[in-house]
Amino acid sequence: GDCHKFWGWCRDEPDPCCEHLTCSTKHGWCVWDGSF
C-alpha cells in the first residue's frame, strides 16, 4: 500500500506519494526537486 519516494507514480493532480516531493509531470513520478 505504501509507495517509494522515488518510484511512487503520480499524475498532474496532488498525490499522497508526493507528500514531501514534487510530482514530475514530464516523467510521471515523484522526485526530490523536479530536476530529474
UniProtKB/Swiss-Prot annotation:
Residues the record lists as Phenylalanine amide modifications: F36
Origin superkingdom: Eukaryota
MF-aspect GO terms: ion channel inhibitor activity; potassium channel regulator activity; toxin activity
Stated family: Belongs to the neurotoxin 10 (Hwtx-1) family.
Domain notes: The presence of a 'disulfide through disulfide knot' structurally defines this protein as a knottin.
Known function: Inhibitor of voltage-gated potassium and sodium channels. Among other potassium channels, it selectively inhibits Kv10.1/KCNH1/EAG1 (IC(50)=236 nM) by shifting the voltage dependence of channel activation in a depolarising direction, it shows a maximum inhibition of 80% at saturating concentrations, it shows fast on-rates, and is poorly reversible. It also slightly affects channel inactivation, when the membrane is highly depolarised (>+80 mV). It shows similar potency on Nav1.7/SCN9A (IC(50)=222 nM) and lower potency on Nav1.2/SCN2A (IC(50)=519 nM).
Protein name: Mu/kappa-theraphotoxin-Ap1a
Organism: Avicularia purpurea
